[in-house]
Amino acid sequence: MNISLIAAISKNLVIGYKNKIPWYLPEDLKWFKQKTINKNIIMGRLTWESIKKKPLPMRKNIVISSNEIKQEGIIWADSISNAIISAQYNQEIMIIGGAKIYKEMLFYANKLYLTHIDIDIVGDAYFPEYKLYPYWKTLFRKKNTKNKMNPYNYSFEILSR
């Protein structure tokens, strides 16, 4: 079973502020879609609420919450372990947030898909300090410069262990 974390992070590891992504980067949205399409995605309740409680199309949406969620297009799980059991084992499992789920799953992940955004920004949700673990090796990295549509320099990186 392959478990991956996918996130967009600022230089100071911010991933969110007031349950929203604190930037708009269309190329990151394309990257996210490309990497998660036709896969299992697991998210926490706050991430679910941040996407306006709408299942992401062409993905198996699994939401972790202590309170049962009954909605077409999602599978509710009361724990990370039950979320993983609900996933299809022949597919990569993509953890899409939030901060608490990332922190709990970093140790179990085989791969990280990161968008590094070249800004320091105020936030209240952070990606875990993954660089503290020396076993992560970069498989792919592509730097991109800001343009009319994407107002920050950014890079895509895939790490594996």
From Swiss-Prot:
Family of this protein: Belongs to the dihydrofolate reductase family.
Tell me which Pfam families the record gives: DHFR_1
Name of this chain's protein: Dihydrofolate reductase
What the entry lists under PROSITE patterns is as follows:
DHFR_1, DHFR_2
**Gene Ontology MF term list:** dihydrofolate reductase activity; NADP binding
Record domain DHFR: where: 2-161
Give binding positions for NADP(+). 7-8, 15-20, 44-47, 64-66, 96-101
Q: Which UniProt keywords apply?
A: NADP, One-carbon metabolism, Oxidoreductase
Query: For substrate, which residues are the binding ones?
Result: I6, A7, A8, D28, R59, T115
Query: Can you cite a GO biological process for this protein?
Result: tetrahydrofolate biosynthetic process
Look up the record and report any one GO term of the cellular component aspect.
cytosol
Q: What is its EC number?
A: 1.5.1.3
Q: Which InterPro entries match?
A: DHFR (IPR012259), DHFR-like_dom_sf (IPR024072), DHFR_CS (IPR017925), DHFR_dom (IPR001796)
